[in-house]
Amino acid sequence: ICSLIKLKDKPFIINKNHKFMAIIPAHNEEAVVADLIESLKKQDYPKELYDIYVIADNCTDKTAEVAKQAGAIVYQRFDETKKTKGFALNWFLKQKIEEDANYDAFCIFDADNIVDVNFLKNMNKKLCQGEDVVQGYRDIKNPTDNWITAGYAIFYWTMNRMYHLARYNLGLSPLINGTGFMVRFDVIKPEGWVTKTLTEDIEFSLKRIIKGKRLGWAVDAKVYDEQPLGFKQSWKQRTRWTVGHIQCIKEYTKPLAIATKENKTLMNLDGLLYIITLILLALNFLIYAGNGMSGLDLFMNCVRYLVPTFLLPIGTAMLIMLLDKRPIKPMLRGLVCYPLFLGS
């Protein structure tokens, strides 16, 4: 129900145009990074109030040269022992903190993104409303290419409405999810961007939730992300996400449980339930398996559990597409294959 309610505007607590860093961590992205830079240069926002930075991270191609020619300020980083996006962001942001750089906030983008012309304007609005960490609306550049890209599109459309919007309307916290998000510069000045898992976005979100800090949601700040076409590449990407999630379980289940007990807030509890979802699913299966059932009975019970688990998202996705006024016909193949996408 909360996902059906339109996001309400907060009153402004300040009215000004803030200065932004647009940061693009990039590893061997010479083929796509210029398109993102061009979309950022076309922002409907005062040009003197944002700078575009590319972190050419352990690149072996011409990412740095292409980005520089496109108009970005390029920082090159070479460190074979620390290769993740989180390390690259911390390396760059520490330099900006030490410089006492004159910025109010920064936005992070993946190199294959295209940014809506009103992105910075809408993030500035969120800053004026008092938000300090805000996730934008993550959409897909290539939703109809094949069933894999369609699966990604349906997943993110569902997350946007059923997770981010619903939680924000309930007074809970959305999560940042990799790209198209904004952070007030002051937030990271005390310690930098310190993350240690493969899913630095989720980790950063959980650390904020543990501190009782709610993240924001900006439905009008849109970024378009390109998704992989091949199953092997998609599998590798989602395996990395799963490993990162497991790392977050190990690192943050106990702190979230302590925060939930001490603060007694729904936001802390919601963060805890999110992080232990994989554990709950595994326990659910073990309860079935350990309930005296074996053979055919166990199989049929699992089928009764799994069928609605995988079919319900199709109906949910169709509802979301209708609410968002998206055409269903081009996505039929993706809808039919969505359970396979989720299960793989």
Sequence positions of predicted segments:
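Membrane-embedded multi-pass helical conduit in multi-pass membrane proteins
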Residues: 12-14, 273-344
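Cell-envelope/extracellular polymer assembly enzymes that use nucleotide-activated donors
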Residues: 18-21, 51, 203
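Long helical/loop segments within the catalytic core of UDP-sugar-dependent glycosyltransferases
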Residues: 76-99, 118-197, 235, 239-250, ...
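A conserved acidic beta->alpha catalytic loop
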Residues: 56-64, 79-81, 114
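Acidic donor-binding/catalytic loop of UDP-sugar-dependent glycosyltransferases
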Residues: 62, 109-126
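Short, acidic, metal-binding catalytic loop of nucleotide-sugar glycosyltransferases
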Residues: 38-49
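N-terminal membrane-anchoring/stem segments of glycan-assembly enzymes
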Residues: 1-16, 67, 320
